[in-house]
Design a protein with these regions (language model features):
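Polytopic transmembrane helical bundles with strong interfacial aromatic enrichment
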Residues: 1-319
Length: 319
């Protein structure tokens, strides 16, 4: 893999990885809150309020990381386009030119507006409507990332298909990652609560497991479409830097699916049975460990996404 020793723009790759990860996690935490935590904890209003508060705080932190890394990404992108240093890029007004005259800039402005809307909704989080609007804004924030990558430069009907696949891919990834972040929060609250949460935790895990299965199915389907557009052939997958890194990404994703399968087929039933007997410690410990491993693997994938976004698609390199 020559990309390992090539001159990769490390700061840009890392910034993209952090930004993609934080944006996806922001949406994912809100998905987890709305579709998993709140329905599962209806029988424990006090505990539900604590979990919702912590998840909202986590969404705030992730939104700040997303906004900060987005500004850094804009600066790095301006430096790359204009061939300027950081000080010159800021003082010369080149960043405003990028914002006003490029697709990247237009998408950045739209996403900034969505981030402001999301922040406003989080401030009014005690009301139902802002909570729902926050989820939509967060999904828009992560979905619009599709227009910053290769999909944004694919033309015609194929471009529409590419964008749709990218949006689905990003949304499904967000839902999965949100659960990986949200479950430990729920477990931490349960561990320090006097309320008997065994059955409620089991219900939350079951709900997230269902979302996880759907997310994996969407990731595989949309990923196949994206690979068909950007790679095009098995030979291109094997002989190009893009294809080889994509194979590594697929291998890491398959490992994540393996851990998710263990959680779904083994640990979730164990947790449900243990909840009835009150002996769920071992199942919870294994689930927490697997969740942490999946999060580490997810960040590794975002690093690869950061690199892939800087490489020429394989289909353009093999004839």
């Amino acid at each position: 893999m020559s990309w390992l020793v090539a001159e990769i723009d490390g700061p840009l790759v890392l910034t993209r990885a952090i930004h993609f990860g934080a944006s996806a996690a922001t949406a994912g935490v809100l998905i987890f809150r709305g579709l998993v935590a709140e329905p599962a904890l209806r029988a424990a209003p006090k505990g539900s309020a604590i979990v919702r508060s912590r998840l909202t705080g986590l969404a705030w932190a992730l939104l700040v990381i997303s906004a900060t890394s987005g500004l850094i990404w804009l600066a790095l992108q301006t430096m790359s386009i204009a061939g300027l240093g950081l000080n010159e890029a800021i003082r010369s007004g080149a960043m405003w030119t990028v914002l006003d005259e490029t697709q990247f800039g237009l998408v950045a402005e739209i996403r900034a507006a969505l981030a402001v809307l999301l922040a406003g909704c989080l401030l009014l989080d005690r009301f139902v409507l802002p909570r729902r609007l926050a989820l939509l804004a967060a999904l828009g924030l992560v979905g619009a990332l599709a227009w910053t990558g290769h999909a944004g430069s694919t033309l015609g009907e194929l471009g529409d298909l590419h964008l749709a696949a990218d949006v689905l891919h990003l949304s499904a990834a967000s839902a999965w990652i949100g659960g990986l972040i949200g479950l430990p929060v729920l477990f931490a609250v349960a561990r320090h609560s006097s309320f008997e949460w065994g059955s409620l935790q089991s219900d939350a895990v079951r709900r997230f497991s269902t979302i996880g299965v759907a997310s994996v199915a969407v990731l595989i389907g949309s990923g196949f479409v994206i690979a068909w557009i950007l790679v095009g052939s098995f030979r291109a997958l094997l002989v190009t830097d893009y294809g080889q890194l994509l194979m590594l990404k697929i291998a890491v994703f398959a490992t994540m699916v393996g851990f998710a399968a263990v959680n779904r087929l083994w640990l979730t039933p164990r947790l449900a049975m243990a909840a009835k007997s009150g002996e769920d410690r071992r199942a919870l410990s294994a689930l927490r460990r697997n969740t942490l491993i999946e999060l580490v693997l997810a960040f590794a994938i975002f690093i690869m996404v950061g690199v892939l976004g800087t490489l020429h698609p394989a289909i353009h390199l093999v004839h």
